[in-house]
Curated annotation (Swiss-Prot):
Record-annotated disulphide pairs: C31-C81, C40-C64, C56-C77
Site (Reactive bond for trypsin): R41, A42
Domain of life (superkingdom): Eukaryota
Gene3D superfamilies (UniProt xref): Pancreatic trypsin inhibitor Kunitz domain (4.10.410.10)
Signal peptide: 1-24
Family: Belongs to the venom Kunitz-type family.
One MF term in the entry's GO annotations: serine-type endopeptidase inhibitor activity
The name this protein goes by in its record: Kunitz-type serine protease inhibitor 5
Species annotation: Daboia russelii
Alphabetized UniProt keyword annotations: Disulfide bond, Protease inhibitor, Pyrrolidone carboxylic acid, Secreted, Serine protease inhibitor, Signal
Any Gene Ontology CC annotation: extracellular space
Major subcellular location class: secreted
Function: Serine protease inhibitor.
Residue ranges of domain BPTI/Kunitz inhibitor in the record: 31-81
Length: 96
């Protein structure tokens, strides 16, 4: 196979690996933690993985405490927890 063909194959394999969702067994345990806005009163839009819908959904983070199921962007959440690309509901305030 030519070097151009090998390069194309490598590129396609890399793309496939990036786009293949993580299976539930490979997903970090913290992806299954419930949404937790924390105890502080800031108003910071964040995203959490919702295992019931297999989506990353918005919520309002208070700025302290909470848990590790808390991402600055939807893309970070999807990449870490392997969520589907469907858009979840708008951010909501989670009650403790």
């Amino acid at each position: 196979m030519s070097s151009g063909g090998l390069l194309l194959l490598l590129g396609l394999l890399t793309l496939w690996a990036e786009l293949t969702p993580i299976s539930g067994q490979d997903r970090p345990k913290f992806c299954h933690l419930p949404v937790d806005s924390g105890i502080c009163r800031a108003h910071i839009p964040r995203f959490y993985y919702n295992p019931a819908s297999n989506q990353c959904q918005g919520f309002i983070y208070g700025g302290c405490e909470g848990n590790a199921n808390n991402f600055e962007t939807r893309d970070q959440c999807r990449h870490t927890c392997g969520a589907s690309g469907k858009e979840g509901p708008r951010p909501r305030i989670a009650s403790n």
